[in-house]
Regions:
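Short polybasic linear motifs
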Residues: 116, 120
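Conserved, well-structured core segments that form or line functional sites
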Residues: 2-112, 122-156, 162-209
Length: 209
């Protein structure tokens, strides 16, 4: 049974939410077709004290979404070319989020060409991994139009064909023994203590069933 995750799920300690997001489904409706994939890799960013977090230097115009209610999208641009997708966690006023780094496309995903939902030629992509946050946002056609929006099926674009973006629980529970953890990627600027925190969680492709 499919169940859309609501604010209550995300309004909990960030590391707990992060681990429980593994095995959940990221779902998007693009050009009338629903595309989806199992979340296989994430990173947690938790509070002012986390030197790897955008919020470590306080609230700004760029990161203000992190301080908002749980269950909303925080999307930002990096390296002048990539959008990065995060979901807000914890209570309002406490800046925390989970970054979605990897997705495994599954059965039921619309057959799309070369990772482009708007392509004219279709090929089956079930089982293809999207590794890296830039690949996830490119394939799912995610940009700053969704920044600050609630994670649900409602489209923020009115009558446009692009729909919402949400996360579903489809009853899959990843055993604790299958969840791997490591330091987050590319956060050396946070210093040795915070760069070394094991706040990256992932499952291997063979365990994404």
């Amino acid at each position: 049974m499919k169940r859309i995750l609501r604010e209550k799920f995300f309004n909990r300690p960030t590391l707990i939410v992060a681990k429980e997001l593994l095995g959940k489904y990221l779902v998007r409706k693009v050009n009338g077709r629903e595309i989806c994939g199992m979340i296989t890799e994430i990173e947690a960013y938790d509070g002012f004290h986390d030197k790897a977090s955008h919020a470590s230097r306080g609230k700004t115009e760029r990161n203000k979404i992190m301080f908002g209610p749980a269950g909303h999208w925080y999307i930002y641009f990096t390296y002048g070319m990539h959008w990065i997708l995060n979901i807000i966690t914890r209570e309002e006023g406490y800046p925390a989020a989970v970054l979605i780094r990897g997705v495994l496309l599954k059965e039921g995903t619309a057959p799309l060409h070369a990772g482009r939902p708007d392509a004219a030629v279709d090929v089956p992509l079930a089982g293809r991994p999207l590794t890296g946050p830039a690949r996830v946002t490119k394939y799912f056609k995610i940009d700053n139009k969704l920044n600050g929006e609630k994670a649900n099926k409602a489209s923020p674009f009115g009558k446009l064909r692009a729909g919402g973006l949400w996360i579903e629980d489809r009853g899959i529970k990843i055993p604790r023994s299958k969840i791997k953890r490591s330091p987050r990627i590319g956060v050396h600027y946070a210093g040795p203590v915070w760069a070394g925190k094991l706040h990256r969680f992932y499952i291997k492709q063979k365990d994404a069933y």
